[in-house]
């Protein structure tokens, strides 16, 4: 009886310590993101939800990215035209089956303006479908690249979309 009580107390204390630790990490990440945006208000902030990312042919690490709240990579770029390339991933659930979707290396040209925040990610719906679903309350679409992906016998449509926050 006493042994099971110690085990339960041990796991509760362990859970509490881990919970507090992760809350501190999340809080620090959020503060860092806010500080990053305020320190770079004269640049374009770009949230990249992709891997193997290159900007103008250079590795993403050359641009000193930070990790955002959703584990995306965030960079501050001086205004101008950029070629951004990367491999985009997402998942979809169909009939209780999870399908992992991954693009090839996609390259796109974007004109970025100072003081704006952009997000580039893969979505399973078009900008028009999202705008209809959100009753027109969506960010401005800067670029949309439709993809057709065939996984086994399933037909999947996906889009790489760049949104500019309003």
Each language-model region and where it sits:
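Short loop/turn and low-complexity linker motifs enriched in small/turn-promoting residues
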Residues: 1-76, 87-166
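A short tyrosine-centered beta-strand micro-motif
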Residues: 80-84
